[in-house]
């Protein structure tokens, strides 16, 4: 990454919503949330983003995800670290990567969320546990609107029963993904 591109990765500007971590443009009906996250399920308590998904950051994510630019993993992990530390709030959570459908993982050769979770783990010593599995494939959410994303993501994830014995039920879980837009994937994972 050149210095110019790095300088153009835009942090999420304040004021931040304390729940979804995005710029709070329109207040929500309840204190502590904005109009974007007020409909999230209670199981998804908070979220955070490393940066705005615009300009070079959006190009990097697309290259990482769709062109196999996995050499960006550490750069992206560095950018995600402050947001992850804010969410952890002094605790050591278990990092849970969002799983890909089998066909998509086979096609890409990697799961970008797993790579990012492992990059965060190298920086924090927090454990990574693949607690979720993708129940079914489906269309990519990248070009879908809010309602379509919610419909596709609903019931798409479940707990992987083989992973459960390794986890204390009182553990804090931090779901890791490359992008958060509407929160549909994060909500579906938290509900699993």
Please report, for each region that a protein language model flagged, where it lies by residue.
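Glycine-rich phosphate/pyrophosphate-handling loop used in enzymes and phosphotransfer proteins
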Residues: 1-192
